[in-house]
Amino acid sequence: MRNRFKLPEHLTMGNFVSAGGAHASGTKDGGNDSGLAAYVASLIDRTLDWNDIKWLRTICGSMKIVVKGVMTAEDAAESVRQGVDGIWVSNHGARQLDTTPATIEVLPEVVAAVSGRCEIYLDGGICRGTDVFKALALGAKAVFIGRPVLWGLAHSVSKGLTVLLSSLH
């Protein structure tokens, strides 16, 4: 949002239309940015802490609890101490954070910190089968992909998805 991005007047951001106001068009009055970053930040509960995992456990019964977004050994160790069933190494696409490390780079330290006490999953930066192989070899139990699937579908629907999945084989 640093570049004061603004959609053309005839376009809207469909995911924000129900929120009303200027956020649907990606604009706001005043300030040096589009206002979208502030709007999205206002949706995040900053009071969340490690104690919330204990609370989740009380209402989830036998449902597995997986913490997503773990990128450090310290957070991995604390996740295990809190009793999670799995850790999902993810930088949430890193497209908004230009200094976030790649998930494959932090995976070995997360695996070492966990020492087999829970399962570890990974997403981010997975574009071909060798990426999947590396993540599994470094200790991930499973690897997830997101954006490449959407790219394949957007490019040529089922044929694009078939090509993408073939490249992961």
Label each PLM-derived region with a short phrase.
Residues 68-70, 89-92, 123, 145-146:
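Generic beta-strand/beta-sheet core signal
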Residues 12, 16-25, 43, 105-122, ...:
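Alpha/beta catalytic cores of nucleotide-metabolism and tRNA/nucleoside-modifying enzymes
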Residues 37, 91-101, 150-154:
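Glycine-rich, proline-tolerant flexible connector loops at the mouths of alpha/beta enzymes
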Residues 48-54, 58, 101-114:
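Short loop-to-alpha-helix "cap/lid" segments that border enzyme active sites
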Residues 1-81, 93-96:
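Active-site entrance/lid segments in N-terminal catalytic domains of soluble metabolic enzymes
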Residues 47, 66-73, 100, 118-132:
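Glycine-rich beta-to-alpha transition loops that act as phosphate-gripper elements at the mouths
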Residues 59-63, 80-94, 114-117, 139-143:
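Glycine-enriched alpha-helix->loop->beta-strand junction motifs that scaffold or abut catalytic
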